[in-house]
């Protein structure tokens, strides 16, 4: 939860939902800035991200002040997550996959039977996560996508941290940053089509 805590709490009430856990993909303000406040209001456990994102969680108050979000606070997860861990929601299990690059401790959640992934800011429909923030690493991001996401299967549908859903197969065919033809060209010394050209709206 990046913020707008009152709206989120109202939505829970409106739809008669019970919040069981808070899952964090990475420590950036727009994904974790409201975590401490929701934890305070509900008492539910915080799971994730990977410990390598402690740096970003510690930066949340400063980042919040910079962007005019006064109640953005740092927090300590009840459970740090690592590659190969499993998280549960009711009786449903999701696999945790550590996918550094956008941030060093970014994780994604994968439901193997449903062919579904929540990928945070690793991958978007037609784009990829930024790596120009502190401790971002462009090559790590490309490796996370090509070596960790693609092997899960082209039929996997994913929800990104921003923008519409897509599938891994669609992105392998047409994403201008990580399509098979692009990564193949880059490996052969072709043009670098990523880097600073990543759309600024994806943070």
Feature locations, PLM:
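Alpha-helix initiation/capping motif
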Residues: 1, 70, 130-134
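Anionic group-transfer/hydrolysis microenvironments
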Residues: 1-2, 123
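Active-site HxH/HxHxD metal-binding segment of metal-dependent hydrolases
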Residues: 3-88, 92, 173-184
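Metallo-beta-lactamase
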Residues: 62-63, 86, 92-98, 103-202
């Amino acid at each position: 939860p990046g913020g707008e805590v009152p709206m989120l709490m109202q939505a829970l009430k409106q739809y008669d939902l019970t919040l069981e856990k808070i899952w964090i993909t990475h420590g950036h303000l727009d994904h974790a800035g409201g975590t401490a406040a929701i934890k305070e209001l509900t008492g539910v456990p915080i799971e994730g991200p990977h410990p390598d994102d402690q740096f970003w969680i510690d930066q949340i108050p400063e980042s919040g002040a910079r962007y005019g979000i006064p109640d953005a606070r740092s927090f300590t997860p009840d459970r740090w997550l690592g590659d190969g861990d499993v998280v549960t929601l009711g009786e449903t299990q999701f696999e945790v996959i550590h996918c550094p690059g956008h941030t060093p401790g970014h994780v994604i959640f994968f439901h193997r039977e449903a062919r579904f992934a929540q990928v945070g800011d690793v991958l978007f429909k037609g784009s990829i996560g930024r790596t120009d923030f502190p401790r971002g690493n462009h090559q790590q991001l490309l490796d996370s996508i090509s070596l960790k996401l693609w092997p899960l299967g082209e039929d996997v549908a994913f929800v990104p941290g921003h923008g519409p859903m897509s599938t891994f197969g669609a992105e392998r065919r047409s994403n201008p940053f990580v399509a098979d033809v692009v990564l193949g060209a880059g490996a052969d010394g072709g043009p670098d089509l990523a880097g600073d050209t990543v759309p600024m709206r994806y943070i």
